């Protein structure tokens, strides 16, 4: 036995159960997430198959309440259940779509949009993970529910769950003098009102229907008997579903047909045992009402078995109109988010990410834009042609100071939203000292980057290893070292003067025009590239504290890293000591704020929130390193740190008040950048500054 419909779906998908009856709204979830398929369909009229395979959604309201779809705002409402066709999909798709009563502010979250529209309500299952994946749905969506303080509260086992439960929620709480709750509507199947009246507890003289359109009388309401013309849409009948992995479903169909033959009719003196489509004999203990719709709808007359080619999948059976209603719930105020990348490998991963997100129905749609350089991406983001990009701390300084871009999401690495810059050497080179780079061969992750430029250049200035004559900082570095690979040091964006000594690119390994470029076209670009440079050509690598561990002991399958051992390398400490690479906490050159996803400062708080929601849902599905479909934080074979850092464990939203580059980078890091600006000329400090003040 499952605790909810969702537990049962999971049990069936794991071959621990076989069959379940679901309305087509929950069937949509069962199909998409748990790969369930239809097997049989409830038939409500054996004399008319066309009408017998459908029912209608209605909204019941008290007589005397001046209501229309728009005045439901801030009102208390009782729903049959989140995700159900009659109590969720049909009415909400129209309130959000053609009627436009509910303002859509968030993507991927009907509940969050509904919270902004309604007052206190009862929406059973709205706190379930299927509708509350991040646990941030607030309690007002359950305050009308009936089993507070128990495990049944606001679930499908709540006394106010289901169609009959929603009617009880409306009637009991309106007529309870001891409660301040005052619901004005119940969203249910049309036939449920007749059951409640027949069972004797629902007075039809007190209630009417709320219509989605204004009637000829000028009113938005109609009598209860007029549900055929005052309803919120026609819904395909409930389904008996099983796992799509079942290759032979005929035994299940035969079993159901056998049940129908023996137990279809009501009990009689000759057959007093059981009725398949009747629930009234099951009285709720200590409650003055009978149960309804147990396993099957009580107004079911028989089951219909569609041809296999029409029901092999949910989508083959359900009519397109209902699927259009489901899609209406997935509306997003941001139709598309454009992500900027700077090399073909990032572009390929971005396109894979876009396809993976689309497969899970995550909104907004993600598109990928390829630009030549990181600076070009910043410029296009500022000008509104793209929306998001990922930058490390040095580039965040440029993005914020020159392009007015803001950080909205940060990477987390297990130790927190930061990492450490370290200097790595081989153990077999004891003559290499942190305090003397003279004639050394250095490998640096990139010009303008925190680990490869800002922090190491500050260190050689602090230890007086260079004299910066004429304020030419880049030239001073070239005179200190014998050879280096500093990707991007020749790029016009970081060195518009063009006066760059060739030895700062002499160790680089990119082919042709790719040599010494500030992206993955240069083999020695980035944190892992700097370490690879050390293993193949250099003597000191300036990189992250995790880089050695990630690329040794067969953790990186690339050919250059296959035979590397972690204990062949050491860290150079600022005080002159050497330590093993695992002692980075006590032997590093400085702490670096985590990489961030940035956007334009003119984006509203709600736009930024929906950008975050895209990534938040994305990491729920693809945030681990074992997903066979797509891995957000893994770059696969051949490249590292594409779009996101490979060492990222999760992404976190930066609070709105802290979404500015100075607050994220902090005073210590900003002082390091200012030190370089104080000693170097414009265009010769390796930190981007626009020509003639124009970015």
For the regions a language model picked out, list residue spans one by one.
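Alpha-to-beta junction loops
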Residues: 13-22, 76, 172-190, 382-391, ...
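Ligand-binding "clamshell"
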Residues: 29-48, 194-229, 398-413, 418, ...
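Beta->alpha turn/N-cap motifs
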Residues: 2-5, 21-28, 33-34, 42-43, ...
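N-terminal hydrophobic or amphipathic helices and topogenic motifs
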Residues: 1-17, 22-25, 41-54, 64, ...
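Secondary-structure junction motif
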Residues: 83-92, 448-457
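Sec-exported extracytoplasmic/periplasmic mature domains
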Residues: 13, 96-100, 171-175, 382, ...
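Short, hydrophobic alpha-helical packing/hinge segments within bilobed ligand-binding/sensory domains
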Residues: 7-9, 165-169, 376-378, 529-533
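Residues embedded in well-ordered beta-strands
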Residues: 58-60, 239-241, 422-424, 596-598
């Amino acid at each position: 036995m499952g605790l909810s419909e969702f537990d049962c779906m999971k049990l069936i998908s794991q071959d621990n159960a076989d069959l379940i009856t679901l309305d087509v709204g929950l069937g949509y979830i069962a199909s998409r997430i748990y790969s369930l398929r239809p097997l049989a369909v409830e038939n409500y009229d054996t004399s008319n198959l066309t009408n017998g395979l459908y029912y209608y959604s209605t909204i019941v309201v008290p007589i005397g309440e001046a209501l229309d779809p728009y005045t439901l705002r801030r009102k208390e409402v009782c729903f049959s259940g989140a995700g159900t066709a009659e109590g969720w999909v049909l009415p909400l798709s129209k309130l959000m779509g053609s009627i436009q009563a509910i303002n859509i502010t968030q993507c991927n979250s009907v509940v969050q949009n509904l919270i902004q529209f309604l007052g206190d309500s009862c929406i059973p299952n709205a706190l379930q993970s299927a509708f509350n994946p991040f646990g941030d749905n607030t309690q007002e969506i359950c305050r009308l529910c009936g089993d507070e303080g128990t495990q049944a509260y606001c679930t499908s086992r709540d006394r106010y769950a289901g169609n009959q439960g929603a009617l009880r929620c409306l009637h009991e709480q309106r007529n309870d003098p001891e409660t301040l709750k005052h619901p004005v509507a119940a969203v249910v199947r049309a036939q449920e009102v007749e059951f409640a009246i027949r069972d004797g507890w629902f007075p039809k003289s007190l209630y009417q229907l709320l219509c989605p359109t204004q009637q000829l009388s000028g009113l938005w309401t109609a009598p209860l008997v007029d549900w055929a013309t005052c309803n919120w849409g026609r819904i395909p009948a409930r389904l008996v579903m099983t796992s799509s992995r079942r290759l032979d479903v005929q035994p299940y169909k035969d079993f159901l047909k056998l049940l129908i033959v023996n137990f279809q009719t009501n009990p009689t003196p000759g057959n007093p045992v059981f009725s398949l489509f009747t629930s009234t004999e099951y009285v709720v203990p200590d409650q003055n009402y009978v149960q309804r719709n147990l396993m099957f709808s009580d107004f079911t007359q028989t089951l219909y078995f569609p041809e296999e080619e029409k029901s092999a999948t949910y989508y083959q059976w359900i009519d397109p109109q209902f699927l259009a209603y489901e899609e209406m719930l997935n509306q997003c105020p941001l139709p598309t988010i454009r992500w900027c990348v700077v090399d073909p490998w990032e572009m390929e991963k971005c396109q894979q990410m876009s396809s993976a997100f689309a497969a899970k129905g995550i909104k907004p749609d993600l598109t990928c834009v390829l630009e030549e350089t990181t600076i070009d991406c910043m410029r296009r983001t500022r000008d509104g042609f793209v929306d998001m990009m990922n930058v490390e701390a040095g580039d965040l300084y440029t993005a914020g100071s020159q392009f007015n871009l803001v950080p909205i999401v940060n990477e987390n690495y297990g130790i927190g939203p930061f990492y450490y810059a370290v200097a790595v050497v081989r153990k077999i080179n004891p003559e290499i000292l942190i305090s003397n780079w003279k004639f050394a061969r250095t490998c640096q992750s990139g010009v303008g980057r925190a680990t490869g430029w800002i922090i190491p250049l500050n260190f050689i200035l602090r230890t007086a290893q260079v004299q910066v004559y004429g304020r030419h900082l880049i030239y001073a570095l070239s005179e200190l070292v014998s050879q280096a690979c500093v990707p991007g040091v020749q790029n016009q964006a970081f060195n518009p003067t063009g006066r760059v000594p060739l030895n700062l690119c002499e160790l680089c390994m990119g082919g042709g025009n790719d040599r010494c470029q500030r992206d993955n076209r240069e083999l020695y670009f980035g944190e892992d590239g700097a370490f690879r440079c050390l293993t193949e050509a250099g003597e000191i690598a300036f990189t992250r504290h995790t880089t050695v561990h990630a690329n040794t002991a067969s953790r990186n399958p690339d050919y250059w890293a296959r035979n590397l051992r972690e204990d062949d390398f050491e860290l150079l400490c600022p005080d002159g000591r050497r330590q093993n690479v695992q002692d980075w906490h006590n032997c590093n050159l400085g702490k670096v704020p985590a990489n961030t996803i940035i956007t334009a400062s003119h984006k509203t708080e709600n736009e930024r929130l929906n950008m975050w929601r895209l990534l938040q849902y994305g990491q729920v599905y693809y945030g681990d390193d074992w997903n066979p479909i797509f891995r957000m934080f893994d770059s696969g074979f051949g490249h590292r740190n594409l779009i996101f850092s490979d060492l990222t464990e999760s992404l976190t939203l930066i609070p709105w008040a802290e979404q500015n580059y100075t607050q994220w980078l902090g005073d210590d890091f900003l002082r390091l950048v200012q030190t370089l600006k104080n000693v170097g000329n414009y265009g010769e400090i390796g930190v981007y500054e626009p020509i003639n003040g124009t970015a």
